[in-house]
């Protein structure tokens, strides 16, 4: 009899978890509290309790070739950076293609997930749900929690003296939907993450004046990178990742700063991070420099005091009149349906082995999928987590002893990747390629470059020097996809097909042949160094 698995949430990670369960012969039941799938990517005019919320203009920060499921590319005619409405359509295509909808119970809230009395032996869970005011209970062999971390807004009002006396309007960025509310207003956006910069830029087209307040600064980059290529297809390669992890941190930091400042000198724009010894998570915004240099957005430091109709920033005694304050101050995460003894959250951190498994459970039958913030796309990350987690739930893969897992968790908390700086979600950050490769190793699905070099050198060069696209994760092992090689070799074709409507014939450069030979030799050297 197939093991029954309860999946909480039908967003990007929930859909991947359903599919992974089916591939391993398990019986998934997904509970989704809203009336449709998509999670974060489904725009609604009103904020829904317990579900991530996005504004109308949201576009993906990772391009389509890097943010798809590993065996299901985006349609060729989709733009490289996908608007939320088309992203939702893609998720629906995925669900229909793999026949996932019949495993989802919509409008069903998970009220509680508790251990059964014999859980020490069976590992089973009792899941209590609510559908149309009717409560039901069922026993499951395992549970996969796929609710993400963008549902509980962090609103640190105590850190803003005088905020209670403010007579204007203030709200968290989670409440923001359209820029119309900013028309002819003086707006202050607090927080310089992706949402904060997006909202400041949008407001600047309608507002009288816009201030963007940041305490620590940030590295702002464009989606359009070298020669107009998508940023992550250039930045996210195995070759570059090897260099970043091999070279001394000061050298990596210097090289990265130099590269980032080629587009925008952050010091001149008042954006440079306060702590430059570490590289913070990138902020993706194509318009911000233009809005700053044309006097539409004003960068300011942290706030000293909030008055009835104004604020005072820390570098001045001048009062700036303000009508609306937007707190783009991030999120905390919690699992209200889980007992604290199952997953305890302290100081924004959950003690999870590989960001997935509670280390103290006697039976590894509960997995948290998608509670991570990689420097890369969430879809392939969550999907890879689900592929490994399902095999652990099934009993095919084993976890280390609890003591070993706890030791690693503690070490991770103390030693975050050195090229990330502090931010609200520091505890969730990870090195994208290194992390995914680690999970792929557990299921014997990590690409073997040495073997590939002998059997398919063209593919090996592309995998090592080209974009680390999700298709690489399906070249071998369980869940191998026969279309993976072709998807890798044609990824640049799909990237340019939608934008290169005007084609000019180009003469082949003799230098290209030299570059190919050089790349091949560089690959040999790199592989030799890896196996030293």
Curated annotation (Swiss-Prot):
Question: Which residues does NADP(+) bind?
Answer: 60-61, 195-198
Provide this UniProt record's keywords sorted from A to Z.
Acetylation, Endoplasmic reticulum, FAD, Flavoprotein, Membrane, Monooxygenase, NADP, Oxidoreductase, Transmembrane, Transmembrane helix
Task: Name where it's found.
Answer: Endoplasmic reticulum membrane
Write out the topological domains of type Lumenal: 2-510
Q: Which SUPFAM superfamilies match?
A: FAD/NAD(P)-binding domain
Q: How is the protein disposed in the membrane?
A: Single-pass membrane protein
According to its UniProt record, what is one Pfam family this protein matches? FMO-like
Task: Please give the catalytic activity noted in the UniProt record.
Answer: hypotaurine + NADPH + O2 + H(+) = taurine + NADP(+) + H2O; hypotaurine + NADH + O2 + H(+) = taurine + NAD(+) + H2O; trimethylamine + NADPH + O2 = trimethylamine N-oxide + NADP(+) + H2O; N,N-dimethylaniline + NADPH + O2 + H(+) = N,N-dimethylaniline N-oxide + NADP(+) + H2O
User: What is this enzyme's class at the first EC digit?
Assistant: oxidoreductase
Cofactor(s) in the UniProt record: FAD
GO terms assigned for molecular function: flavin adenine dinucleotide binding; hypotaurine monooxygenase activity; monooxygenase activity; N,N-dimethylaniline monooxygenase activity; NADP binding; trimethylamine monooxygenase activity
Q: Return the InterPro entries for the record.
A: FAD/NAD-bd_sf, Flavin_mOase, Flavin_mOase-like, Flavin_mOase_1, FMO-like
Which chain regions cross the lipid bilayer?
511-531
Chain ranges on the Cytoplasmic side, renumbered to this chain: 532
Which GO terms of type biological process are on file?
Answer: energy homeostasis; negative regulation of fatty acid oxidation; organic acid metabolic process; response to lipopolysaccharide; sulfur amino acid catabolic process; taurine biosynthetic process; toxin metabolic process; xenobiotic metabolic process
Similarity-based family: Belongs to the FMO family.
Protein name as it appears in the record: Flavin-containing monooxygenase 1
What's the gene?
Answer: FMO1
């Amino acid at each position: 009899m197939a093991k029954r698995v309860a999946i909480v949430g039908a967003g990007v990670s929930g859909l991947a978890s359903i599919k992974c369960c089916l591939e391993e012969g398990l019986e998934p039941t997904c509970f989704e509290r809203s009336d449709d799938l998509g999670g974060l990517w489904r725009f609604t005019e009103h904020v829904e309790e317990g579900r991530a919320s996005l504004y109308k203009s949201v576009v993906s920060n990772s391009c389509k070739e890097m943010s798809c499921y590993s065996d299901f590319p985006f349609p060729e005619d989709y733009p490289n950076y996908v608007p939320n409405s088309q992203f939702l359509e893609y998720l629906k295509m995925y669900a229909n293609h793999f026949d996932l909808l019949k495993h989802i119970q919509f409008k069903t809230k998970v009220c509680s997930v508790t251990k059964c009395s014999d859980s020490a032996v069976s590992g089973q869970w009792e899941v209590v749900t609510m559908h149309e005011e009717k409560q039901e209970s069922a026993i499951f062999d395992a549970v996969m929690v796929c609710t993400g971390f963008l549902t509980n807004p962090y609103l640190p009002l105590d850190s803003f003296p005088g905020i209670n006396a403010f007579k204007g309007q203030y709200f968290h960025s989670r409440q923001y939907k359209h820029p119309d509310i900013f028309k002819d207003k003086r707006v202050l956006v607090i927080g310089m993450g992706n949402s904060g910069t997006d909202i400041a830029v949008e407001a600047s087209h309608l507002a009288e004046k816009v201030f963007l307040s940041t305490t620590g600064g940030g590295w702002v980059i464009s989606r359009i990178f070298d020669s107009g290529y998508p940023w992550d297809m250039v930045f996210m390669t195995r070759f570059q990742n090897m260099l970043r992890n091999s070279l001394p941190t000061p050298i990596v930091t210097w090289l990265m700063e130099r590269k980032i400042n080629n587009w925008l000198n952050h010091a001149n724009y008042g954006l440079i991070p306060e702590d430059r010894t570490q590289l913070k998570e990138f902020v993706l915004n194509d318009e911000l420099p233009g809005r700053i240099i044309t006097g539409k957005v004003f960068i300011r430091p942290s706030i000293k005091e909030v008055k009835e109709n104004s604020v005072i920033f820390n570098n001045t005694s001048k009062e700036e009149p303000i009508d609306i304050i937007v707190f783009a101050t991030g999120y905390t995460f919690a699992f209200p349906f889980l007992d604290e003894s199952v997953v305890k959250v302290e100081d924004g951190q959950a003690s999870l082995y590989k960001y997935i498994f509670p280390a103290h459970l006697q039976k590894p039958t509960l997995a948290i999928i998608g509670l991570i913030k990689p420097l890369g796309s969430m879809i392939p990350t969550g999907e890879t987590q689900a592929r490994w987690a399902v095999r652990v739930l099934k009993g095919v893969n084993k976890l280390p002893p609890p003591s070993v897992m706890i030791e690693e968790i503690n070490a991770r908390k103390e030693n975050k990747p050195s090229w990330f700086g502090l931010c609200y979600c520091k505890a969730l950050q990870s090195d994208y390629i290194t992390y995914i490769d680690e999970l792929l190793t557990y299921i014997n699905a990590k690409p073997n470059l040495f073997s590939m070099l002998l059997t398919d050198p063209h593919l090996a060069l592309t995998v090592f020097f080209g974009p680390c696209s999700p298709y690489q994760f399906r070249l071998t092992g369980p869940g191998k996809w026969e279309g993976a090689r072709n998807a890798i070799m044609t990824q640049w074709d799909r990237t340019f097909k939608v934008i290169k409507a005007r084609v000019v014939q180009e003469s082949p450069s003799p230098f290209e042949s030299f570059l190919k030979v050089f790349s091949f030799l560089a690959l040999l050297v790199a592989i030799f160094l890896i196996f030293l």
